[in-house]
């Protein structure tokens, strides 16, 4: 007799894994929105030094990293939640806030992990379509919030569409969300978003919204994707405590903590790398438009493009792969006929545009 699994397993969608990790070195990896820059040398050195102590469990209080983040953003450490990547925090938030009979509201397409929260908890997931410019339709989202809504997710900049909401739009929306409902503003790509001004701007929203969390990561601008370090800045200690209550112990390893603390200390280098990425993003967008593609106004470290003929998506993705260029197909992210393309090195970007010129 086969093993009987829980009913929720049948509801949870599989995460769309990126391909290419076993294809060798001569591949342009433009599918996972990683940084094309290595971590800062001090972050690498800190992680290496920390390896000598991994016979011991990590510091379960994570105080050095909490304090470093608190000092940077002016947030008390007890209102900062950490995680093994921001996905870890998202899933824990779902476990803490959702249950059968509750509701979760988010735009779609958005980050591929969002559907897991409702499916795993048995909560009703309400997916609100993006508007005609592939941006969040905040009016439509607000209209879906009820007394049963426990959690609202806003991905800004949005993954996979790269589009952003201005701070005043977000602030107005938050004023329409009842206090019983938690809001996670997923800001994984905020460092690249010129429309937001700077990474401190949205932190001010926490002063008047105790139900709000700003979810961020070291995987993108800081180049620590392989170490998996995410963090959330919470409007209240109660929200942080509820999420931590459902966590496994020792969820953030010692080298990752050490590297993240060091990475925070080199903001000038982070800003230089972000500026380089933004410049390359503009060039890549212009190149795609020159090939007849519609390209969203990106505020991330990737671009989102609609192909001139949506029916050739699979052919284009396959042709790029044959030429050693890996991108993410829109059909795997909720919108057929599109591509999500990470900003890579200058050589990788040129290789991608050259391949697209051959295929279109």
Residues of each region from the PLM?
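N-terminal "arm"/small-domain region of PLP-dependent enzymes with the aminotransferase-like
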Residues: 1-56
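Conserved N-terminal alpha-helix of the aminotransferase class I/II PLP-enzyme fold
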Residues: 45, 49-84, 281
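Conserved beta-loop-alpha segment that forms the PLP phosphate-binding cup at the N-terminus of a helix
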Residues: 63, 77-101, 228-230
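PLP-dependent enzyme catalytic core of the Aspartate aminotransferase-like
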Residues: 168, 311, 318-328, 332-360
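PLP-dependent aminotransferase class I/II
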Residues: 211-296
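Conserved PLP-binding catalytic core of the aspartate aminotransferase-like
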Residues: 278, 290-323, 339, 343
């Amino acid at each position: 007799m086969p093993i009987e699994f829980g009913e929720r397993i049948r509801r949870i969608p599989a995460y769309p894994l990126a391909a290419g990790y076993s294809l060798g070195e001569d591949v342009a990896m433009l599918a996972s929105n990683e940084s094309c820059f290595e971590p800062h040398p001090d972050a690498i050195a800190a992680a290496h030094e920390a390896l000598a102590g991994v016979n011991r469990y990590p510091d379960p209080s994570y105080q050095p990293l909490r304090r470093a983040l608190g000092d940077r953003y002016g947030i008390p450490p007890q209102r900062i939640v950490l995680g093994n990547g921001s996905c870890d925090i998202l899933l824990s938030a779902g476990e803490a806030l959702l249950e059968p009979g509750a509701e979760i509201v988010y735009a779609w397409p958005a980050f591929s992990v969002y559907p897991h929260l409702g499916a795993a908890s048995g909560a009703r997931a309400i997916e609100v379509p993006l508007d005609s410019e592939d941006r969040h339709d905040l009016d439509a989202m607000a209209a879906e919030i009820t007394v049963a809504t426990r959690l609202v997710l806003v991905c800004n900049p949005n993954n996979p569409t790269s589009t952003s909401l201005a701070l005043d739009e977000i602030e107005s929306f938050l004023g329409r969300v009842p206090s019983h409902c938690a809001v996670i503003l997923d800001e994984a790509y905020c460092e690249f978003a010129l429309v937001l001004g700077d990474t401190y701007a949205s932190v001010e929203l926490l002063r008047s919204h105790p139900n709000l969390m700003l979810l961020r990561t070291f995987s993108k601008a800081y180049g620590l994707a392989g170490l998996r370090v995410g963090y959330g800045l919470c409007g209240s200690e109660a929200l942080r405590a509820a999420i931590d209550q459902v966590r496994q112990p020792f969820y953030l390893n010692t080298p990752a903590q050490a590297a993240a603390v060091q990475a925070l200390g080199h903001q000038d280098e982070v800003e230089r790398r972000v500026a380089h990425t933004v410049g390359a993003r503009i060039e890549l967008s212009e190149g795609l438009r020159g090939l007849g593609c519609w390209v969203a106004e990106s505020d991330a470290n990737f671009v989102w493009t609609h192909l001139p003929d949506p029916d050739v998506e699979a052919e284009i993705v396959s042709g790029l792969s044959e030429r050693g260029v890996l991108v993410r197909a829109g059909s795997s992210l909720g919108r057929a006929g599109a591509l999500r393309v990470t900003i890579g090195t200058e050589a990788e970007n040129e290789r991608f545009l050259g391949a697209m010129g051959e295929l279109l």
